[in-house]
């Protein structure tokens, strides 16, 4: 991660941004990337009571190559998609979790039905439910942190869906989502890499550190 940007997109900006092929094919993209796991948890089983978290994390929240991390409310997915298409015109790839990762709630439902459900009482075990939620949320938080560290920069879409409208973008941002809070907080502490720029001048190859 090199730098972060707090971005406010107006309705007029959005109208211009969504004029790209990626935005027009957004429904197809969601169906392509948001696949439902059909084989349940069988592939993750170590034994009757243990699951392989590493394999599960690689399957549900894989680490991919991307230049830009777009932090957004899921209610602003269309805006994130439009921005992703805009960056693509410049040869820059963007990470938008909804397109690359499966939904954590679906994984939780699979785990809870497998490990926490009591058929005799037709209820879920409260303690076990807390454990599955903790494990899945920790995997997701770890995956988000890894992707943020890997990307060149972060764009936070500052909208009424993601932040308190009264927030002063020059100061603190008050968010409604625990995941957006995690991303904003992580950016404050994540390592800031020195960016190396390469350019040629009069036949000589030079390097500069920004």
Model-derived segments and spans:
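Short catalytic/ligand-binding loop motif for oxyanion handling, primarily in non-cytosolic enzymes
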Residues: 78-79, 102-106, 162-167, 205-208
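Conserved N-terminal substructure of TIR/SEFIR domains
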Residues: 2-151
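Charged, low-complexity C-terminal accessory regions
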Residues: 58-61, 191-210
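Acidic, Ser/Thr-rich peripheral helices and adjacent loops at domain boundaries
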Residues: 113-123, 181-185, 207-210
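Conserved TIR/SEFIR loop-to-helix hotspot centered on a Trp-containing motif
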Residues: 135-136, 162-193
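Glycine-rich, N-terminal phosphate-binding loop of Rossmann-like dinucleotide-binding domains
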Residues: 158
């Amino acid at each position: 991660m090199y730098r972060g940007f707090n971005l406010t997109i107006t309705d007029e900006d959005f109208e211009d941004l969504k004029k790209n092929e990626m935005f027009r094919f957004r429904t197809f993209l969601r169906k392509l990337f948001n696949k439902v796991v059909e084989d349940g948890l069988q592939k993750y089983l170590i034994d009757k009571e243990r699951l392989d978290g590493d394999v599960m994390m690689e399957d549900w929240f894989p680490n991919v190559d991307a230049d830009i991390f777009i932090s957004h409310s899921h209610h602003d997915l269309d805006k994130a998609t439009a921005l992703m298409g805009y960056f693509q015109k410049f040869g820059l790839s963007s990470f938008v979790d909804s397109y690359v990762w499966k939904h954590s709630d679906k994984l939780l439902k699979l785990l809870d039905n497998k490990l926490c459900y009591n058929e005799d009482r037709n209820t879920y075990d409260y303690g076990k439910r807390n454990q599955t939620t903790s494990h899945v949320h920790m995997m997701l938080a770890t995956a988000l942190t890894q992707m943020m560290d890997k990307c060149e920069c972060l764009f936070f879409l500052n909208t009424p869906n993601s932040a308190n409208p009264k927030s002063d973008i020059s100061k603190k941002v008050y968010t409604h989502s625990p995941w957006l809070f995690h991303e904003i907080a992580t950016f404050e502490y994540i390592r800031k890499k020195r960016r190396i720029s390469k350019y040629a001048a009069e036949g000589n190859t030079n390097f500069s550190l920004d």
